[in-house]
């Protein structure tokens, strides 16, 4: 794999059962020169356990979460998990965080969703305090007060430093963000952005959001050293129509079924691309139980906006378009070790 845009492998979160070939995929990614292997979590399998398990057989590839649920762990618990994996992997961990949506946050994790931007900022500040290990960790809140005081507490809480000395105080933090304010926040306080449903056609809009964050006082990074690790479905095929048909049910789920009807950040991504009418109709059909119809009405051009599907020459050219748009790492999925190797040969 030549220098330039890097590749990441997205293992995602599990379905009904653990996947059978992920150890093989991780080994193939390590051998083929992939930069990073990512795991995710929602309301089933967690991200850290499989990343540690499969990552234990690797020596080079970075091990990232894309993403862990911010509401699943307190900031200090998150920092502990991250510093532990960073030690075990010899300094190869990337912490990817996401706020999810109110249905999952309040319905599964039992946490309050409002003020996601403020919560994220406070959360990351505490995580970095833990890793810095310069003084006992404190936070004035209002979302994560440390030590916790006030009504219902004993008043005995004590500010603490982590027992374990982190291997790195600067473990990279990336943010899964879709809206303008969250993307700007990623540029301001994080080391990278983890976009889903990225479209190079919209790069100008994304750059405005990012530049707002880079321009803020005290911004952590600049354009030159900030990573954009975009998730992309890449399908090498001579039958684009069949591939599009296979992707549309997935898009219908995310546009129509993920999140509440009036609060679906994935749907908002496609609205910003100019597909408001399609999104509204997909949502209506999906939520009325007509899921097949919801997928069928999605136009090919909507699919093509945020995926790469075609023969090898087309895929290679489109990957160059994504790189020119500012993507530093394309995070892909693969069903076999052969597909991992085929993708690695394209960059």
UniProtKB/Swiss-Prot annotation:
The UniProt record lists the keyword Oxidoreductase: yes
Gene3D superfamilies linked: Luciferase-like domain
SUPFAM superfamilies from the UniProt entry: Bacterial luciferase-like
GO MF: oxidoreductase activity, acting on paired donors, with incorporation or reduction of molecular oxygen
Class of the enzyme per the UniProt entry, highest EC level: oxidoreductase
One GO cellular component term: peptidoglycan-based cell wall
Keywords: Oxidoreductase
InterPro entries: F420-G6PD/mer (IPR050564), F420_OxRdatse_Rv3520c_pred (IPR019951), Luciferase-like_dom (IPR011251), Luciferase-like_sf (IPR036661)
EC number(s) from the headed UniProt entry: 1.-.-.-
CDD domains from the UniProt entry: Tetrahydromethanopterin_reductase
Domain of life: Bacteria
Protein's name according to its UniProt entry: Putative coenzyme F420-dependent oxidoreductase Rv3520c
Native organism taxonomy: Bacteria, Bacillati, Actinomycetota, Actinomycetes, Mycobacteriales
């Amino acid at each position: 794999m030549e220098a330039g845009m890097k590749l990441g492998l997205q293992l995602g979160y599990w379905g009904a059962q653990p996947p059978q070939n992920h150890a093989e995929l991780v080994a193939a990614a390590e051998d083929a020169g992939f930069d990073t292997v990512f795991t995710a979590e929602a309301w089933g399998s967690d991200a850290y356990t499989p990343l540690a398990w499969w990552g234990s057989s690797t020596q080079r590839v970075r091990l990232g979460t894309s993403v862990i649920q911010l509401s699943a762990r307190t900031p200090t618990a998150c920092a502990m998990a991250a510093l532990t994996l960073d030690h075990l992997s010899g300094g190869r961990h990337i912490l990817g965080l996401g706020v999810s949506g109110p249905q999952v946050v309040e319905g599964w994790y039992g946490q309050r969703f409002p003020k996601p931007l403020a919560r994220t900022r406070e959360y990351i500040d505490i995580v970095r305090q833990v890793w810095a290990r310069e003084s006992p960790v404190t936070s004035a809140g209002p979302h994560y007060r440390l030590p916790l005081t006030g009504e219902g507490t004993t008043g005995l809480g004590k500010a603490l430093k982590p027992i374990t000395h982190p291997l790195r105080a600067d473990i990279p933090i990336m943010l899964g963000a879709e809206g303008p304010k969250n993307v700007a926040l990623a540029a301001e306080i994080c080391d990278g952005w983890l976009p889903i449903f990225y479209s190079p056609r919209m790069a100008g809009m994304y750059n405005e959001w990012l530049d707002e964050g880079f321009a803020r006082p005290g911004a952590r990074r600049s354009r030159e050293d900030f990573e954009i690790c975009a998730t992309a479905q890449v399908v090498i095929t001579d039958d684009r129509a069949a591939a599009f048909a296979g992707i549309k049910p997935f898009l219908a789920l995310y546009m129509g079924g993920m999140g509440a009807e009036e609060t679906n950040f994935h749907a908002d991504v496609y609205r910003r691309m100019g597909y408001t009418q399609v999104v509204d109709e997909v949502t209506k059909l999906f939520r009325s139980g007509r899921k097949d119809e919801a997928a069928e009405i999605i136009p090919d051009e909507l699919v093509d906006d945020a995926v790469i599907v075609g023969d090898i020459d087309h895929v290679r050219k489109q990957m160059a378009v994504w790189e020119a748009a500012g993507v530093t790492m394309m995070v892909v999925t693969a069903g076999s070790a052969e597909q991992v190797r085929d993708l690695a040969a394209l960059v």
